[in-house]
Regions:
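Conserved N-terminal phosphate-binding loop of PLP-dependent enzymes in the Aspartate aminotransferase
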Residues: 1-236
Length: 236
């Protein structure tokens, strides 16, 4: 929503989104559209203004070469795709995506609802590659109460900063700024820092790799480890 209006406010017409295969971004209509999960959204016809690519730099470059000036955003789950099968990929893909988004004037969105707060072994993947918009949730409140945050760069903010009411981002959910959720969020952040969860996650990753490295079993196709995530893919 923010990315779409960003270009409207700048009097530019862009109508396409670049997303990833195996992606999942939620269950509202627009997030279902940019996701690649027919298993979840089989009852809803998929629109044709979204391109889905693999986490392959050659496919990424081809997509921008063919449609770069039509995209208003590229949205990804950075480094780790959760509901799409715990798929893990290299940060070089995100670095190239950042370069191409800058070259073609496309907003880069990181959906860190699942990957944020250390899940990948990084506090945020956004610390390594800076997006224009980042979405946060889940661990933000420690799982005790539903709450989320959307963080935007100065560039995005400035496109909405105007005396013209038509340029404002009209967004006001009933539970926005909920006091109980905000309190849980503040405490969750305090605990995350005080108990040094990044160090704990590092130990989990190190131990898991030591334990599972080289493990062979005819029933197991692959074992993937990243940060606090362990994916064991069975042979089907």
């Amino acid at each position: 929503k923010m990315a779409m209006q960003y270009y409207v406010n700048k009097n530019q017409r862009r109508e396409k989104v670049l997303s990833l295969k195996n992606s999942y971004h939620g269950d509202t209509f627009k997030t279902m559209e940019v996701g690649d999960s027919s298993e979840y959204h089989f009852a809803f016809k998929q629109k044709t203004n979204v391109d889905h690519i693999n986490t392959n730099i050659e496919e990424l470059e081809d997509a921008f070469k063919n449609h770069g000036e039509e995209y208003y955003c590229m949205i990804v789950e950075p480094l780790l795709q959760g509901a799409g099968g715990m798929k893990m990929y290299d940060i070089s893909f995100l670095k190239r995506a950042r370069e191409l988004c800058d070259e073609y004037g496309v907003l880069l969105i990181f959906d860190e609802v699942a990957t944020g707060f250390g899940r990948t072994g990084n506090r945020f993947v956004s610390d390594l590659v800076l997006p224009d918009i980042v979405c946060l949730g889940k661990a933000l409140t420690g799982g005790y109460i539903g709450h989320a945050a959307t963080v935007a760069s100065d560039k995005v903010y400035e496109a909405f900063y105007s005396d013209e009411s038509g340029k404002a981002l009209m967004h006001g959910p009933t539970f926005m700024g909920n006091a109980l959720a905000m309190t849980a969020g503040i405490k969750s952040l305090e605990i995350f820092k005080r108990e040094n969860y990044m160090k704990k996650i590092s130990h989990i990753e190190e131990f898991s790799k030591k334990l599972l490295s080289g493990y062979k079993n005819p029933k197991i196709k692959e074992i993937r480890i990243m940060g606090g995530c362990i994916a064991v893919e069975a042979n089907n």
